């Protein structure tokens, strides 16, 4: 029967159930005359055909349908997932004596005729008895129906961030009280309920029903936008009621299957998805994305995900005057959204997960497990990404943070003991397992919104350190040669200008050019090194400098005149310029981020070893023998360079994917999974190729590339204008002018030793303290010592007695070298290989290196002239003022690159926006809309 037929039968045959099957219409003939006429014709036809029993069966079905009410006639379609109504009893279950009737009707007509009258009388008697029994047990049957078909109950509604249970209906309480009294008495003699509505009661017409439906619709519309869940009230078993045991056995089994954990969780996700998109805005996001209007998409998405009444964000986004303000507003909203989606406010997971069939007995007895389920706020806290505090706006950090937040919220909906969220907090105790744990990437916030704890990224691959150390050691031997070449002039010029030790005459001007030509040649080498590392590769370019180094030192050692010495110094300076450019680039592209700072400082440390070696050897050797020693140093450097591979990034830039994979396997270890890193390199290279132009100079002048290039140039400028090379080149002369009682060569050895020790201290601290902290310490140390040195030379120039503080210059030099070697010595070269974008890394590094050697040449060449012009005190004070300016440059311009991948650094430096595909996938939880 349809819903309309049910209503007709319920109105027309209301008294038929109590009065028997004779007159189905009763007193309602004036309301349902067509039904009465049809029933009369049907009775006439069946009686004439000898099938009066069939008429009784039809009339009984109509009587049974009086109490059958479909859910569709009460509540129309609604997007909320209502539970299904209890299954209706089949008429044959109410009339068991009619179940065999179809077989009897299939018998031949001639066999049925002799028994027909007897069967009619027997069935008529049974039917009359059944109707009388049905009338007596009608109140009990109605109560059973109420108990079986439990009324729908609304889940708790959100009101001012609190959860309140709606009050129970008075009628429902009365029914529960009556049921309790019946069960307590255990008697079947029950007081009959009032009969069904009769014709004296006004019939509810279509208009009245439509009014009720409209009220229901309005009430449901008011519920939209809130997190509402519909479920049945808890089932109450009645073991004393034997009349319903057989009918409820199958229903209870089905209910246990339907109430399984997975079904509850899926239903919970569907309800959550429906409640989140309460304004229906997500359906037009595809059209918005097609028009590439990112701000409009963000505004729409935020409003659609806003469930706590913060529509003011849309106006904030419209009023954003700049991109930075827009990002700030969006980050603030993310925090609000994550807090609004926090289970401690919007979910009551204990009710959703109550009665889960997958929970074991062991879990049920676990007090901690129960506490976590019944108090979701103890399971998780909202996790937001404070990109400003972390100094990172990279796509990778954002996605990683979002995935971590989604994972935590997903686990909070899962009551299974094996993946409880509170066990994830033990990650903080495993920080010692790997250096990677020292990289903070998200912060948990407390209820007041202030950062309190740090969460650490779990390790994915073990750091296979030995191959990376071998690679760093191989290229660092080249830096040893560079340091030896830089310090050569300080001890060599003393013996070279001695006519007794030299077969040719060296004037003061020639000596000035011997010391100053190498920085000038380094400028040329830095310019040429950029294209070389792009076309030949990083490793091949470094390898190509070994043989010219040997030739340059042989030219100096075998020189018979000044031009041969200058030629050898120029060739050595050219190789120094190329090596100083390519060494940090190679290490930056081969070493993992966790140890890039430590291994990245090895070239600087070996360079200082070369300086110290040159100072010590210069004490016992003349300039010619010292040059032969310098020619022997590139030999082990040449041998070790054949053992290491090219950088994977350069292979990817040339389309050699298989060679890049082999290089990564060699660097990371055979057991390491290199595919994610390789895919990241290929994706980064693809992005660089899309944005690259054929004109290299135009690439350098792009706004997105100017920022990292300017930072690199600024670091190089303040490194050289701090006066370090002037101090190194003229250490002996400075100590003579200061009137020190120590031998000049001894002072030089002391300075070199301090430089070497300070560099290794920096190696230990750079991946723990960070780049900027070391730059701050370095600046402060240099500023103090330069001003003190200036004061010392000022007092000496004005005739004051400084003999009592004769060791002051040495102490100041030691502190100055210590501060420089901690920060401004190695970090500018290290950060040059980190912050420059991949597509311009070669050309930009060439410009930065050339600029560095230009500053070196200017400072070295003009230092003696500067002393003559403004005095030694004026020169040191000038360097101190420049270091003060450098401090502000570091504070406001230099980013922190500690623990970040090159891709993360590049995205932040270039200010690259997030891809629309990744933005579109940002949802509160990973469910299907």
UniProtKB/Swiss-Prot annotation:
Keyword match Transport: yes
Annotated coiled-coil segments of the chain: none
GO biological process, one term: trehalose transport
Residues modified as Phosphoserine: 320-322, 392, 394, 917-918
Biased composition regions of type Basic and acidic residues, renumbered to the chain: 41-59
Highest taxon of the lineage: Eukaryota
Annotated glycosylation sites: 500
Main location: membrane
Topological domain ranges for the Cytoplasmic compartment: 1-462, 534-541, 591-596, 646-708, 767-772, 826-839, 895-929
Region (Disordered): 1-275, 352-371, 398-420
Record topology, Extracellular segments: 484-512, 563-569, 618-624, 730-745, 794-804, 861-873
Polar residues bias (residue ranges): 60-72, 402-413
Protein localization: Cell membrane
Pfam annotation, one family: Sugar_tr
Keywords for the protein's UniProt record, in alphabetical order: Cell membrane, Glycoprotein, Membrane, Phosphoprotein, Sugar transport, Transmembrane, Transmembrane helix, Transport
SUPFAM superfamilies: MFS general substrate transporter (SSF103473)
Residue stretches of biased makeup (Low complexity): 85-141, 168-178, 237-254
GO molecular function term, any single one: trehalose transmembrane transporter activity
GO cellular component labels: plasma membrane
Listed Gly residues bias regions: 10-26
Similarity field: Belongs to the major facilitator superfamily. Sugar transporter (TC 2.A.1.1) family. Trehalose transporter subfamily.
PANTHER family listed in its UniProt record: FACILITATED TREHALOSE TRANSPORTER TRET1-1-RELATED (PTHR48021:SF96), PTHR48021
Function, as annotated: Low-capacity facilitative transporter for trehalose. Does not transport maltose, sucrose or lactose. Mediates the bidirectional transfer of trehalose. Responsible for the transport of trehalose synthesized in the fat body and the incorporation of trehalose into other tissues that require a carbon source, thereby regulating trehalose levels in the hemolymph.
Name of the protein: Facilitated trehalose transporter Tret1
């Amino acid at each position: 029967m349809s819903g309309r037929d049910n209503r007709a039968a319920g109105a027309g045959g209301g008294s038929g159930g109590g009065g028997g099957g004779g007159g189905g219409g009763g007193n309602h003939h004036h309301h349902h005359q067509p039904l009465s006429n049809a029933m009369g014709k049907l009775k006439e036809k069946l009686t004439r055909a000898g099938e009066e029993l069939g008429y009784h069966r039809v009339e009984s079905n109509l009587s049974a349908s009086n109490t059958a009410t479909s859910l569709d006639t009460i509540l129309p379609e609604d997007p909320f997932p209502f539970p299904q109504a209890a299954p209706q009893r089949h008429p044959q279950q109410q009339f068991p004596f009619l179940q065999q009737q179809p077989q009897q009707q299939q018998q031949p007509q001639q066999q049925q005729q002799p028994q027909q009258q007897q069967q009619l009388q027997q069935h008529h008697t049974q039917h009359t008895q059944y109707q009388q029994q049905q009338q007596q047990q009608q109140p009990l049957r109605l109560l059973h129906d109420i108990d079986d078909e439990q009324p729908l109950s609304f889940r708790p509604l959100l009101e001012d961030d609190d959860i309140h249970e709606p009050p129970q209906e008075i009628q429902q309480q009365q029914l529960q009280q009556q049921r309790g009294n019946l069960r307590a008495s255990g008697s079947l003699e029950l007081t009959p309920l009032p009969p069904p509505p009769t014709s004296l009661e006004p019939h509810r017409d279509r208009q009245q029903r439509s009014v009720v439906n409209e009220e229901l619709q309005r009430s449901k519309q008011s519920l939209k936008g809130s997190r509402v869940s519909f479920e049945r009230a808890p089932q109450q078993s009645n073991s004393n009621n034997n009349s319903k045991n057989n009918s409820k056995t199958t229903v209870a089994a089905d209910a246990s299957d339907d109430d399984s954990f997975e079904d509850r969780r899926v239903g919970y996700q569907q309800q959550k998805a429906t409640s989140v998109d309460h304004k229906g805005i997500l359906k037009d996001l595809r059209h918005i994305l097609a028009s590439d209007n990112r701000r409009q998409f963000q505004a729409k998405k935020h409003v659609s995900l806003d469930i706590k009444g913060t529509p003011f964000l849309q106006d904030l986004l419209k009023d954003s005057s700049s991109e930075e303000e827009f990002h700030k507003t969006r980050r603030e909203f993310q925090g609000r959204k994550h807090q609004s989606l926090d289970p401690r406010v919007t979910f009551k997971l204990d009710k959703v997960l109550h009665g889960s069939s997958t929970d074991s007995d062991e879990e049920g007895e676990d007090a901690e497990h129960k506490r976590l389920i019944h108090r979701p706020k103890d399971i998780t806290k909202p996790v937001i990404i404070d990109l400003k505090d972390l100094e990172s706006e990279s796509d990778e950090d954002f996605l990683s943070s979002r995935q971590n937040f989604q994972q935590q919220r997903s686990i909070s909906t899962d009551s299974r003991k094996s993946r409880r969220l509170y066990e994830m907090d033990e990650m903080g105790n495993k920080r010692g397992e790997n250096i990677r744990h020292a990289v903070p990437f998200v912060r948990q916030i407390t209820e007041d919104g202030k950062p309190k704890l740090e969460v650490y990224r779990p390790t994915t691959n073990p750091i296979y350190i030995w191959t990376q150390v071998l690679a760093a050691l191989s290229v660092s031997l080249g830096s040893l040669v560079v340091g030896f070449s830089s310090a050569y002039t300080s001890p060599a010029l003393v013996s070279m200008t001695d006519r007794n030790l030299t077969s040719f005459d060296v004037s003061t001007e020639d000596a000035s050019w011997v010391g100053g030509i190498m920085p000038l040649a380094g400028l040329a080498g830095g310019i040429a090194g950029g294209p070389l590392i792009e076309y030949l590769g990083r490793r091949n370019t470094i390898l190509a400098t070994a043989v010219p180094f040997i030739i340059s030192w042989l030219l100096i050692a075998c020189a018979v005149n000044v031009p041969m010495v200058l030629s050898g110094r120029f060739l050595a300076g050219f190789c120094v310029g190329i090596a100083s450019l390519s060494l940090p680039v190679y290490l930056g592209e081969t070493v993992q981020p966790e140890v890039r700072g430590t291994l990245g400082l090895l070239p600087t440390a070996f360079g200082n070893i070369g300086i110290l070696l040159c100072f010590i050897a210069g004490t016992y050797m003349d300039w010619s023998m010292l040059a032969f020693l310098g020619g022997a140093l590139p030999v082990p450097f040449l041998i070790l360079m054949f053992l290491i591979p090219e950088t994977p990034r350069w292979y990817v830039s040339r389309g050699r994917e298989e060679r890049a994979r082999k290089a990564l396997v060699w660097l990371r270890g055979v057991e390491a999974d290199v595919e994610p890193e390789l895919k990241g390199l290929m994706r980064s290279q693809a992005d660089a190729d899309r944005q690259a132009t054929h004109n290299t100079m135009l690439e350098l002048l792009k706004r997105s590339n100017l920022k990292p290039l300017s930072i690199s140039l600024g670091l190089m400028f303040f490194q050289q204008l701090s006066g370090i090379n002037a101090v190194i080149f003229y250490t002996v002369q400075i100590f003579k002018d200061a009137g020190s009682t120590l031998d000049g060569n001894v002072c030089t050895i002391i300075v070199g030793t301090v430089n070497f020790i300070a560099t290794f201290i920096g190696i230990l601290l750079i991946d723990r303290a960070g780049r900027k902290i070391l730059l701050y310490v370095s600046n402060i140390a240099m500023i103090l010592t330069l001003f003190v040195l200036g004061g010392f030379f000022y007092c000496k120039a004005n005739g004051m007695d400084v003999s009592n503080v004769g060791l002051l210059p040495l102490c100041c030099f030691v502190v100055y070298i210590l501060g420089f070697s901690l920060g401004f010595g190695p970090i500018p070269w290290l950060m040059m290989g980190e912050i420059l974008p991949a597509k311009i890394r070669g050309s930009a590094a060439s410009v930065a290196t050339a600029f560095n050697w230009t500053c070196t040449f200017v400072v070295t060449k003009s230092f003696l002239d500067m002393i003559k012009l403004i005095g030694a005190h004026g020169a040191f004070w000038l360097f101190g003022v420049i270091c003060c300016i450098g401090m502000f440059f570091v504070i406001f311009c230099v980013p922190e690159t500690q623990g970040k991948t090159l891709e993360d650094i590049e995205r932040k430096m270039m200010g690259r926006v997030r891809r629309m595909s990744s933005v579109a996938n940002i949802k509160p939880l990973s469910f299907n809309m």
